[in-house]
């Protein structure tokens, strides 16, 4: 999972950086780049999960810290990242950054490198919500067709002129309609949808959750207490588009769903495994226990479901903290997965900001304050050691969603939700044939 907290230092001896003297033969930019590269090398050599695979490349050999960071990473690593816009990234992860307020899936036209996008969801009150809805098709970006290399432009802040598409049989064609949206800063509450359904003796709560961020734990409290007041017997948790996020938020969510008698505050919830040098040090000193183990926390909204079962909707975009949540819940209650196979990311990333050593203390490097690195530092498992492979989690009930059918999230006829409702009520559901596109986080 990606953690949004800054680890300024776990302890000084492991984070000690080699000071860099200014060299009059190099430009100030070169000196700053070298200093940043030294910081990268120092932290990866200490905390990186695959620390023993880091190549011996000198910090001064690269002028671009992003390039230097990349060449040090293991071939196993698809996730570690670096940014020179620390505030922007942290705001995005906290759900308070600049955004258009939509989630998109992408596809490629047959026999072409040209792509299209389909709206998965929009946040209420967002720029996208004013003009777009789930199922809308985008075929042009700023009056031009677009390829895979252009996809990031659909989420980068600014103003977009989107050429819309329409279905014509099995094909997609331009509709002639153009939509203009401008990004803005907003609070993107990850509790996107809450609904109640009744099926026979079952009162079912449905919650669509798009991102793990403790900024919005209060939204979980509000939603779950409303579910409790309604007397729900069953929960459907929709994580199909949840790419992960804050470990504190996932711990909180687990603590609110696991049956109350088992979710005792301070009881072990999950385990973390670091590289061998870090693991040895952490195990030798109890002050680092929270880096090895995570524990149930107080939530004031535990559902204490009578069924002691939860239904979770999944896809290939169910990633990291979402998978952590599924794994942890499995150790304490029945978990039924509905949808398609999850992504398969069972590692934790920590954020480090540039610092240097001064008089035995670590001091923030103000000249590099805009930089931040997020290396993979540990693997997670539940208390039973699951998951123990690199494969995604396969649902017991496979259902492929169809973004082309125009059915909105939270609608009882939406295929994944409809399947979960049918499983809870014990009724059979006829799966409609439809088209699906592959997506990835």
Could you describe each region identified by the protein language model?
Residues 1-8:
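Bacterial N-terminal signal peptides that target proteins for export
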Residues 4, 92-95, 152-154, 197-198, ...:
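A general structural signal for short secondary-structure junctions and capping/turn motifs
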Residues 16-19:
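C-terminal motif of bacterial Sec signal peptides marking the signal peptidase cleavage site
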Residues 21-234, 256-259, 431, 435-441:
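Flexible, low-complexity junctional segments that flank or bridge functional domains
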Residues 122, 210-212, 240-242, 313-316:
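Short strand-loop junctions, especially beta-strand C-caps/beta-turns
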Residues 216-227, 232-234, 243-441:
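C-terminal "post-core" interaction segments
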